[in-house]
Amino acid sequence: EKREKQLQEWNDIGYETVSHSTVLQAVSVCVNGACSRKDILNKIDKQEFINIWEEIDDDFGKAIDYLKKALGVAVSKLLPYDGLLVPFVYFFHKHPQTPSAIQSKYLKDYFWRCVLTNRFSNALESKLAQDVTHVMDEIIQGNQPQYEQGIDVTYEFLKRNGTFSTGNALIKGLLCLLAGRSPRSFKNDIPVVIDNAWLSQGNSKNYHHFFPK
């Protein structure tokens, strides 16, 4: 019932496509610092889940608001990975206040590192557990996280990995950047409405506002 209410609220703000599993992963990392299937099934009892639900729901709201305003993720279909929402929920669970300027800088850096390195293309659960501990906990303390993997933003990298696909994390990241610049229709110059319905269709005519043929 509470999840249904949450979905109704998320539908109003364009985040209705976030999966049930992402919600469970977020609850688990906030409670246990990990989100494997075993962690979810064996380490969270029913009453604990009920008791923490309202708080986590509020954390989701703060995370979504931040992603919308600071990173241009206007709707959930623009999330490079559904799972990328989880560390941001964890951040706001541990740090309910508005991020400081330095924290916001590191949060944005983390987001783009995930996009440019295809961070969550595999081993999602273990990487989420790593990131809440080694990245988000550091950012909460105002420290710059240390990353093992570098990033590549060369022309060759973008050409090799930038083939248009609605499921491509890099393409979604570029769409976030472009959507934040208030795209307008080539036909009549009215603002382009960005919603999950047309983002789900790879052949949607609206994509030409971003990727002209």
Where are these regions (language model features)?
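A cross-family structural signal marking well-folded subdomains
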Residues: 5-161
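Intrinsically disordered, low-complexity N-proximal targeting/linker segments that flank membranes
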Residues: 119-208, 212-213
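Extended alpha-helical scaffolds
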Residues: 1-3
